From Swiss-Prot:
This is Dephospho-CoA kinase. SUPFAM superfamilies: P-loop containing nucleoside triphosphate hydrolases. GO terms for molecular function: ATP binding; dephospho-CoA kinase activity. Its EC number is 2.7.1.24. GO terms for cellular component: cytoplasm. It comes from Nitrobacter winogradskyi (strain ATCC 25391 / DSM 10237 / CIP 104748 / NCIMB 11846 / Nb-255). NCBIfam families: dephospho-CoA kinase.
Length: 199
């Protein structure tokens, strides 16, 4: 089974691209959704122990947690040390299930794939991109986004140009969903011929 890592900076259209891979019959692991789930389950106690006052009724309050870690690199590192092992276990279980089901390709959707060294655990990397204007429009359309929060997120992400240089495939979401579907079909056809390179 070929494992594709799907990544892209904020506002590039990665979630839509992941959904379209899924619609094409490809199993997709969503790291963000898994984080949401573990914040309501097994990570809550660990997060509260490391960052007191960040849980409510046994669930992580993302806004309270964000306020404690967004501008503190050491705190962010501590949070990652809690979350990443749990995410790894879920991702491995997903990949085993996908392989057992006979999938030829599986996608892992990881926003910080390059930033965490995750590209070494996949066979190919797809980077999702768009124009800076469309990216900005999408980001500002999010009700909970502030310029301060955006700057903090962007500071943790590799620049789009660097991600595109390191990608095996680039999906441009600037031209609508049908264009993205076409690009996904082309990627899946090309990926079927690629050698496996996971370490």
């Amino acid at each position: 089974m070929l494992v594709i890592g799907l990544t892209g900076s904020i506002g590039m259209g990665k979630s839509t691209t992941a959904r379209l891979f899924s619609e094409a019959g490809v199993p997709v692991y969503d790291a963000d959704a898994t984080v949401h789930a573990i914040y309501e389950g097994e990570a809550a106690f660990l997060v509260e122990a490391a960052f007191p006052g960040t849980t409510v009724n046994g669930k992580v309050d993302r806004e309270k947690l964000s306020a404690k870690v967004v501008h503190d690199a050491a705190a962010m590192k501590r949070l990652e040390q809690i979350v990443h092992p749990l995410l790894y276990d879920y991702r491995q279980a997903f990949l085993q299930q996908a392989e057992r089901s006979g999938a030829a390709v599986a996608v892992i959707d990881v926003p910080l794939l390059f930033e965490t060294g995750g590209e070494r655990s996949v066979d190919a990397v797809v980077v999702v991109t768009t124009t800076p204007e469309i990216q900005r429009e999408r980001i500002l359309a999010r009700g909970n986004m502030t310029s301060e929060k955006l700057k903090a997120i962007q500071a943790r992400q590799l620049p789009d140009a660097e991600k595109r240089k390191r990608a095996d495939f680039v999906v441009d979401t600037s031209h609508g969903v049908d264009a993205v579907r076409t690009q996904i079909r082309e990627i899946l056809a090309a990926a079927a011929k690629m050698p496996r390179r996971r370490s």
